[in-house]
Amino acid sequence: MQMFETERAKLERNGGSLSIGLLDIDNFKRLNDELGHSAGDEALKALAGTVSKTLRPGDHVARYGGEEFVVLLPETAVGEGEQVLTRLQRSLTNGLFMHKQKQVFVTFSAGVTAYRGAERIEEALERADQALYEAKRTGKNRTCIG
C-alpha cells in the first residue's frame, strides 16, 4: 500500500500519530441477494462517495477487498479516529440511495487502531479487523477500537 508507506515515512521524519480504520458494509450479502449485485455496487459507491466527501484533505481511503475499505487518518489519535468514523457512519445513514425506485438504507461497521511505530501494516490491519468484527458482533453500525 503506497499511501501507507508515504504516511509511515512522514511519521518517521516528523513524529505524530496515524489511525488506521477498516470499514465494512453491514448485511452486504443480504443486500446483494435481495436486490441484486447492482444494488451492492451502488451501496459501495454510496459509501465511497460519503467517505470522500467527509474526510479531510490528507486523509486516505482505498477499497480493501469485497465490501471493505481502509482509511488512513494522519495526525489523528485513535480516539479521534473513532470519532471520524462515527461521523462517517452518521453521514451515510442520513442519506438513502435509490435502487430501481426503491430507497435503500446502508450502514457500515468499523474498526480503528493506532499505528505503532515500526510495525508492519499487516499487524495494524489485523487489529483494525478484529475491532471491526467486534463492532459487527455487538450490533453493527458502530465503531470499535482495536
Segment roles from a protein language model:
Residues M1-S17, N27-E75, G79, Q83, ...:
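Cytosolic catalytic cores of cyclic-nucleotide second-messenger enzymes
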Residues K10, K53-G58, R90-K102, L132-E134:
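Short catalytic/binding micro-motifs of nucleotide second-messenger systems
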Residues S19, S109:
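Cell-envelope/extracellular polymer assembly enzymes that use nucleotide-activated donors
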Residues I20, K100-Q101, T143-G146:
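Short, hydrophobic secondary-structure boundary micro-motifs
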Residues G21-D24, G66, A128:
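Conserved metal-coordinating catalytic motifs of nucleotidyl cyclase and c-di-GMP turnover enzymes
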Residues R63, G81, L92-F108:
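Catalytic core regions of nucleotide second-messenger enzymes
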Residues V78, E82, T86, A114-I145:
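Catalytic-core segments of nucleotide cyclases and related cyclic-nucleotide turnover enzymes
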